[in-house]
């Protein structure tokens, strides 16, 4: 992160494995922001689909709630979980008014869950965050600022690194690299939803298809 000019990552004094304790202090960034975070920040909707993700959901939400870009709508879409995911999401929503919970009632799959969040999203920009991911506090800001500053730009993505609970890096494929384009983090202008439609209701890789649909 440091070579990219980002805040350094630290291990927080929290229980659990190292991955669940990742953090970075966005305080220096927030102290330069106005008292009303929506005053100069467009609303970004973050769709967070979850299915039986009670063990990981808290880490994902903690990362989103700590974003330097504070004007967020966090849409947790529970896809018919049989564990405590829905209860945990509702508890988080009681603590943070930016969190909204949508309950599917039964398991429909990852992309129907994303589509439910897509339909409900009210932000000027919309993105997705997987339930088992952690995001650096500057992630949302670094994706949305180019969209605001360059009106002709339609979408942005981030990059990801796969690690285990002990933060040991692991390769996703048999390739000589560690960092990959994160098409599931696609952030787009809300207007594209009307022009391009929703994710295909398939089991895998609909996010990649949507990425190329924009191209």
Where are these regions (language model features)?
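Conserved nucleotide-sugar donor-binding catalytic segment
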Residues: 174-215
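Conserved donor NDP-sugar-binding/catalytic core segment of glycosyltransferases
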Residues: 134-172
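A conserved acidic beta->alpha catalytic loop
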Residues: 78-87, 106, 130
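Short aromatic/hydrophobic "clamp" motif used to bind/position activated sugar donors
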Residues: 126
């Amino acid at each position: 992160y440091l070579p990219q000019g980002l805040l350094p990552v630290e291990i927080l004094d929290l229980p659990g494995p190292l991955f669940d304790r990742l953090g970075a202090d966005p305080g220096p960034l927030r102290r330069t922001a106005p008292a009303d975070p929506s005053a100069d920040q467009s609303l970004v909707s973050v769709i967070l689909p979850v299915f039986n993700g009670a063990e990981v959901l808290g880490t994902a939400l903690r990362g989103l709630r700590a974003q330097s870009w504070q004007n967020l709508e966090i849409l947790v879409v529970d896809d018919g979980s049989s564990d405590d995911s829905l209860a945990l999401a509702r508890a988080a929503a009681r603590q943070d008014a930016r969190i909204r919970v949508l309950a599917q009632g039964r398991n429909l799959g990852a992309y129907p869950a994303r589509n439910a969040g897509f339909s409900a999203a009210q932000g000027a920009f919309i993105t997705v965050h997987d339930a088992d991911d952690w995001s650096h506090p500057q992630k949302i800001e670094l994706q949305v600022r180019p969209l605001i500053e360059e009106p002709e730009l339609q979408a942005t993505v981030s990059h990801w690194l796969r690690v285990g609970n002990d933060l040991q890096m692991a390769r996703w494929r048999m390739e000589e690299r560690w960092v990959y384009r994160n098409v599931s983090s696609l952030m787009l202008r809300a207007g594209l939803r009307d022009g391009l439609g929703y994710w295909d209701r398939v089991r895998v890789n609909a996010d990649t298809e949507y990425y190329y649909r924009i191209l």
